[in-house]
A protein has these predicted regions:
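Active-site cofactor/cluster-binding pocket
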Residues: 1-142
């Protein structure tokens, strides 16, 4: 959920129209949370139909496998980066930020707007660590 929130803010700061939706699959009992995020000039619905997703970012390999049906023909599945991510983050709680760093290299959003979005969400709470991990995900060690 935090990852979709940060991505949404980064897109807003870039000047895009943003719609976001979350589907909670018994998350309070350890189930998955599926977030859909769309941005562009004019976005009318937050839900993305099966076979139309441009980027799939999953934080568990099993979830990536289950959600693969959502990917479009030209879609990019970032699930394969999970192994690298787990080696690069100091704690699992930073995995989503690392994955956002990877995703950010594909999207038309300036790095400054990603950083601004991270600051918007985290304020002072682990802000330096989150920025560092985000930059590692981008392949830019700070």
């Amino acid at each position: 959920m935090t990852a979709a929130e940060i991505c949404g803010w980064a897109a807003i700061f870039e000047g895009f129209h943003v719609k976001k939706s979350e589907v909670h699959g018994m998350a309070q009992r350890g189930g998955s949370v599926e977030s859909h995020l769309r941005f562009g000039k004019n976005v009318f619905s937050p839900l993305i139909p099966d076979g139309k997703v441009d980027f799939l970012v999953a934080f568990y390999r099993e979830e990536g496998g289950r959600l693969k049906k959502l990917l479009g023909p030209e879609g990019v599945d970032l699930t394969g980066v999970l192994e690298e991510a787990q080696k690069c983050v100091p704690e699992r709680k930073y995995l989503n930020i690392f994955m956002l760093g990877k995703l950010s290299s594909f999207l038309p959003i300036k790095k400054e707007n990603w950083i601004k979005a991270i600051e918007q969400i985290f304020h002072n709470k682990n802000l330096a660590e989150n920025k560092t991990v985000f930059m590692k995900g981008r392949g830019e060690d700070r």
